[in-house]
C-alpha cells in the first residue's frame, strides 16, 4: 500500500514500525530506546542476548534471537549495524520488499535533525566525554537527550529522551559514519591510528576525515578541540569554524591547573573564560579523564551552565559501565583479597592511560593485568605498542584475541604478543586460549593486596562480572 504523507499530520507517526538488525550492539540499543520513548514500534534481532536487549524488551521492544527474513515483515524502516553482513537474510528481505534501510549513523542523524546536536568524536574517550557532557547539561537543568556507547551508571541506561533541545551523541570515526552527522557543536578528544583497515591503512585519511567532520558544522557552529593532543591541535587552523580549545596546556581556552590525583579522584583548578576559576573534584581517576571533564566543562560554559553547577556535576558523576569500573575488594582464598577494576580499554594508548591512573591511585599495589586483545588487525597494526605498554605491568595474563568477526592473522595472536613481551625481559606473561580460563589461572598469579585490571573490548567484562557474581570462586569454569 502506498501511503500519502498528508494522511497523517505527524510525519513521525506515518511510518511507526522500525526494526533494528543487530539491536544488541552498543551503538544500536541507545537509538532504539530513544525511538521507543518517542512512540515508535521497535523490533530488533541479534545473535546474542545481553542486558541491553533485555532492557529494551522490558520497555516494549520485540527482540528476536537470531536473524530471519520473517523478522522484517510489516516494518516501515530497517536500521542496520555496521557489524552486519550484506548477505544477512533480514537485509536481503528488506531490499526485496523495498523497505528503507538506514545505517545506524544515518538514523542517529535523523534524531539530530529535530534537536541541536552535540557530537563527540575522537579515537579515545568518546563515551566518557559524552556521558560527562550529558551529566553537566542535566545538572544545569537543560534536560538533554543522550545516546551513549556505554551505560551511564547514574541513569542505568545508555540513552534517555529529554525534554530539552540538546542531543548529545558519540560520533563514530571507526568506519567514517560520523560524516553523516550535522551537529551544532563538535568535540574532538584525540586522533590516533586505529581502525586503519577502514581507511586504506593510511593515517592521513583518518586525519582528513576529522577535518571533514568539522566542515559539517554550520557557519554558526562550534568546534571544541583538545589542545593536548598534537593531531587535534593541528585542526585548530584547519577548522574554518568557530573554535574553542580545552586542555591542561596553558594556551587552552578552558584548562586545568594544579592537577593532582587523590586515589580514584582527580583534583584540579578549572579555569574558564572571563577569568572564572573554581576548584574541582572529579570522581574519576587519571589525567585523561581530566581532559574529558574539560570538554564537558567547555560545553557547559558555552550553553550557560553556571561554573559552580559544572563543578557539582563533575564531583557527583559516578561513571560509565566498563570504564575504570571499580568492583571493589574480592577474596582470592586463604583470607587474601585483591582490588578488581573492569575496563573497556583495548588500544595501547588507552591501556597506558588506565595503567597511569591505576598507579597514580594505588601506587603501593602490584599491578596485575588480565587483557583480552580485540581484533587481529588492531593487534597486528599496534603490535609493538601493545608489547611496550603491556611489558610495564607487574604481572600479565593474556587471553586469545577476540576476533570481532575477523579471521586470524599469522603473528598477531596472543602467543606472538606474549613472545614479544617476554623478549623485553621485564615480565613473563601467562597465555590462556579461552577468556573463561582466566578464572582458573588468576589465583596462581595474584597476591594479597594486588590491583587486578581486567581489560578489553570483547567479552572479558562478562568474566569480571561472573567472578563478582560467584563470589570470586576461582577454579570453576
UniProtKB/Swiss-Prot annotation:
Protein name as it appears in the record: UDP-N-acetylmuramate--L-alanine ligase
What is the similarity comment for this entry?
Belongs to the MurCDEF family.
Residues at which ATP binds? 122-128
The UniProt record lists the EC number as 6.3.2.8
Q: From what organism does this protein derive?
A: Xylella fastidiosa (strain Temecula1 / ATCC 700964)
- InterPro entries in the cross-refs: Mur-like_cat_sf, Mur_ligase_C, Mur_ligase_C_dom_sf, Mur_ligase_cen, Mur_ligase_N, MurCDEF_pg_biosynth, UDP-N-AcMur_Ala_ligase_MurC
Which EC class heads this enzyme's classification?
A: ligase
The alphabetized UniProt keywords are: ATP-binding, Cell cycle, Cell division, Cell shape, Cell wall biogenesis/degradation, Cytoplasm, Ligase, Nucleotide-binding, Peptidoglycan synthesis
Reactions catalysed according to its record: UDP-N-acetyl-alpha-D-muramate + L-alanine + ATP = UDP-N-acetyl-alpha-D-muramoyl-L-alanine + ADP + phosphate + H(+)
- Which pathway is recorded for this entry? Cell wall biogenesis; peptidoglycan biosynthesis
Main localization category? cytoplasm
A Pfam family recorded for this sequence: Mur_ligase
The role this protein plays is: Cell wall formation.
GO-annotated molecular function: ATP binding; UDP-N-acetylmuramate-L-alanine ligase activity
Which biological processes are named by the entry's GO terms? cell division; cell wall organization; peptidoglycan biosynthetic process; regulation of cell shape
Q: Which PANTHER family match?
A: UDP-N-ACETYLMURAMATE--L-ALANINE LIGASE, UDP-N-ACETYLMURAMATE--L-ALANINE LIGASE-RELATED
Q: What is the lineage of its organism?
A: Bacteria, Pseudomonadati, Pseudomonadota, Gammaproteobacteria, Lysobacterales
Q: Where does it sit, as one GO cellular component term?
A: cytoplasm
Query: Which subcellular locations apply to this protein?
Result: Cytoplasm
Amino acid at each position: 500500500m502506498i501511503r500519502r504523507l498528508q494522511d497523517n499530520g505527524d510525519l513521525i507517526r506515518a511510518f511507526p514500525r522500525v526494526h533494528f538488525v543487530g539491536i544488541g550492539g552498543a551503538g544500536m540499543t541507545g537509538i532504539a530506546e530513544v525511538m521507543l520513548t518517542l512512540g515508535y514500534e521497535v523490533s530488533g534481532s541479534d545473535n546474542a542476548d545481553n542486558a541491553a536487549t533485555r532492557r529494551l524488551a522490558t520497555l516494549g521492544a520485540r527482540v528476536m534471537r537470531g536473524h530471519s527474513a520473517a523478522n522484517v515483515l510489516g516494518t516501515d524502516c530497517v536500521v542496520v549495524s555496521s557489524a552486519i553482513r550484506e548477505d544477512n537474510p533480514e537485509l536481503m528481505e528488506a531490499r526485496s520488499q523495498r523497505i528503507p534501510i538506514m545505517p545506524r549513523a544515518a538514523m542517529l542523524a535523523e534524531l539530530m535533525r529535530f534537536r541541536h546536536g552535540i557530537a563527540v568524536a575522537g579515537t579515545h574517550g568518546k563515551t566518557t566525554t559524552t556521558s560527562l557532557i550529558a551529566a553537566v547539561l542535566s545538572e544545569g537543568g537543560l534536560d538533554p537527550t543522550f545516546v551513549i556507547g556505554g551505560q551511564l551508571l547514574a541513569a542505568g541506561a545508555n540513552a534517555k529522551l529529554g525534554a530539552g533541545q540538546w542531543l548529545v551523541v558519540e560520533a563514530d570515526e571507526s568506519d567514517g559514519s560520523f560524516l553523516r552527522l550535522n551537529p551544532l557543536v563538535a568535540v574532538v578528544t584525540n586522533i590516533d591510528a586505529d581502525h586503519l583497515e577502514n581507511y586504506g591503512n593510511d593515517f592521513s585519511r583518518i586525519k582528513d576525515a576529522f577535518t571533514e567532520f568539522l566542515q559539517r558544522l554550520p557557519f554558526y557552529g562550534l568546534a571544541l578541540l583538545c589542545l593536548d593532543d598534537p593531531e587535534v591541535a593541528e585542526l585548530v587552523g584547519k577548522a574554518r569554524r568557530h573554535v574553542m580549545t580545552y586542555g591542561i596546556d596553558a594556551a587552552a581556552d578552558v584548562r586545568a591547573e594544579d592537577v593532582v590525583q587523590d586515589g580514584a579522584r582527580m583534583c584540579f583548578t578549572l579555569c574558564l573564560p572571563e577569568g572564572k576559576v573554581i576548584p574541582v573534584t572529579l570522581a574519576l581517576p587519571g589525567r585523561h579523564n581530566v581532559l574529558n571533564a574539560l570538554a564537558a566543562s567547555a560545553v557547559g560554559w558555552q550553553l550557560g551552565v553556571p561554573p559552580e553547577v559544572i563543578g557539582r556535576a563533575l564531583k557527583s558523576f559516578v561513571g560509565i559501565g566498563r570504564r575504570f569500573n571499580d568492583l571493589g575488594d574480592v577474596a582470592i582464598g586463604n583470607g587474601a583479597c585483591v582490588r578488581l577494576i573492569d575496563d573497556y580499554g583495548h588500544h595501547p594508548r588507552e591501556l597506558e592511560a588506565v595503567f597511569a591512573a591505576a598507579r597514580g591511585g594505588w601506587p603501593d599495589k602490584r599491578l596485575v593485568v588480565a587483557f583480552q586483545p580485540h581484533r587481529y588487525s588492531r593487534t597486528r597494526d599496534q603490535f609493538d605498542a601493545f608489547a611496550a605498554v603491556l611489558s610495564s605491568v607487574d604481572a600479565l595474563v593474556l587471553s586469545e584475541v577476540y576476533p570481532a568477526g575477523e579471521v586470524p592473522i599469522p603473528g598477531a595472536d596472543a602467543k606472538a604478543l606474549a613472545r614479544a613481551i617476554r623478549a623485553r625481559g621485564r615480565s613473563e606473561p601467562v597465555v590462556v586460549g579461552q577468556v573463561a580460563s582466566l578464572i582458573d589461572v588468576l589465583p596462581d598469579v595474584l597476591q594479597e593486596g594486588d590491583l587486578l585490571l581486567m581489560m578489553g573490548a570483547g567479552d572479558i567484562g562478562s568474566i569480571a562480572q561472573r567472578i563478582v557474581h560467584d563470589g570470586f570462586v576461582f577454579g570453576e569454569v
